[in-house]
């Protein structure tokens, strides 16, 4: 059982890694399912055992990239002990992610504007699952600035702010619109701080 499951996960991982490399090299639009299976060294039919289509692979990759970016950012921010309030910590996390994507625009192109946050329903369904998001949610819920708000309200606000920042990051870094990212950072971070300040 374990061996069979292990082989399944290995094939899925091979497909994801092949797709990721190809998307970085030539872009998703110029990559076919056949290209992915050829690079992964698996039969074309195997692809459809794991993914409905190329879009499903892209979504899985975006989830993986998003998770890694968020994990790295949180680890870095934890070391910044001078950050005392939650809004400043949130800004630091976003800034770390933006800087990582600015330095690696190929990854930004794969991610597009679709930073994927683990669903709150998944967290609520299994409190022991997804340790990163459970840890983050605990930090958020114990922040004085979030007092009086429900978990869902907090999650909605944070994901909306994060999605806004990622969309602006994509446009600013790759297209220079509405301005370059350095010019947009103060605007974004002011919005984040205002949205997360304690309610009176």
Predicted regions and their residues:
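Alpha-helical DNA-contacting segments of helix-turn-helix folds
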Residues: 51, 58-68, 72
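Short hydrophobic/aromatic patch on the recognition helix
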Residues: 41-51
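Amphipathic alpha-helical packing segments from all-alpha helical-bundle domains
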Residues: 67-74, 100, 119-146, 152-159, ...
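Solvent-exposed, amphipathic alpha-helical segments
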Residues: 14, 18-25, 68, 72-79, ...
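Hydrophobic alpha-helical connector segments
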Residues: 60, 74-103, 157, 161
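Short, structured helix-loop boundary elements
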Residues: 12-13, 33, 55, 59, ...
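Basic, helix-initiating cap at the start of DNA-binding domains
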Residues: 1-26, 30-39, 56
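Amphipathic alpha-helical segments used for helix-helix packing
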Residues: 88, 100-120, 137, 170-174
């Amino acid at each position: 059982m374990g061996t069979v499951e292990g082989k399944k996960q290995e094939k899925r991982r091979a497909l994801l890694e092949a797709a990721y490399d190809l998307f970085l090299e030539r872009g998703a639009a110029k990559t076919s399912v056949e290209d992915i299976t050829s690079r992964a060294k698996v039969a074309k039919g195997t692809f459809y055992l794991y993914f409905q289509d190329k879009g499903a692979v892209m979504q899985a990759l975006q989830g993986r990239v998003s998770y890694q970016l968020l994990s790295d950012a949180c680890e870095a921010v934890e070391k910044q002990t001078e950050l005392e309030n939650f809004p400043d910590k949130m800004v630091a996390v976003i800034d770390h992610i933006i800087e990582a994507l600015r330095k690696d625009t190929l990854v930004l192109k794969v991610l597009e504007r679709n930073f994927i946050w683990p669903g709150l329903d998944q967290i609520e369904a299994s409190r022991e699952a997804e340790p990163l998001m459970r840890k983050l949610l605990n930090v958020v819920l114990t922040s004085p600035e979030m007092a009086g708000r429900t978990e869902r309200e907090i999650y909605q606000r944070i994901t909306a702010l994060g999605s806004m920042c990622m969309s602006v990051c994509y446009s600013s870094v790759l297209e220079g619109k509405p301005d370059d990212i350095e010019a947009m950072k103060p605007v974004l971070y002011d919005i984040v701080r205002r949205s997360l300040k304690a309610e009176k």
